[in-house]
């Protein structure tokens, strides 16, 4: 875990302001709550939007709560996001922030987890992706195309021996990890920044107790993903663990040959 120094925080905030000020080809949306009937979000699997403005990715109402009942749910922004421009080769920079709560009412050792991911625009829940595969990886094939930030509750054979936050590139064998200080029922806030000139993906994780962790990895998104992508969340659980998104915002800017702004508030 890395503590965030003031100079580094100012640098990241500066990047955020640059992104927000550049109106070349941009997409922006902000959901302080995610209300039922929101057509800007596509639900897959067990995901549903609750009346209180929470996006529930997995089922958590099994009775008794100790029952083993696998659940997989995903939620995607319905509009494809321009990631890179084929004419210029330019790649978008973006900032996304979200908050979530994972609740483990059974008291058993929680399993599986949640991932924010970027994938091809036609992405669906893969076959063989339940449980430890977090709804993004088909365990029967090596062809999986995505970039993600995972919050993993359980150490599987391919994981570090701890609950962890990991940056994933086409695999759940994370390229970089830090410890995930999970507390059932607590609100976690996340900001992810991709700086395209440096190909740097950075995440800042703020826990409810004020503790801050960071994780960063160099990744060329143009080499991994198509020019238009889907962005969203996926979660899996094997017991009655709920993975709930409370808020989500996203802003991207791409220097392209023609420009427009797409906004959803």
UniProtKB/Swiss-Prot annotation:
Gene Ontology MF terms in the entry: carbohydrate binding
Positions annotated with a glycan in the UniProt record: 59, 127
Lineage: superkingdom: Eukaryota
InterPro entries referenced in this protein's UniProt entry, alphabetically: ConA-like_dom_sf (IPR013320), L-lectin (IPR016363), Legume_lectin_dom (IPR001220), Leguminous_Lectin (IPR050258)
UniProt key word Iron: no
Tissue specificity comment: Most highly expressed in the epidermal layer of developing shoot tips.
The UniProt record lists the keyword Glycoprotein: yes
Annotated keywords: Calcium, Glycoprotein, Lectin, Manganese, Signal
Range of residues in the leader sequence: 1-21
Family of the protein in this entry: Belongs to the leguminous lectin family.
SUBUNIT field: Monomer.
Protein name, per record: Non-seed lectin
Record organism: Pisum sativum
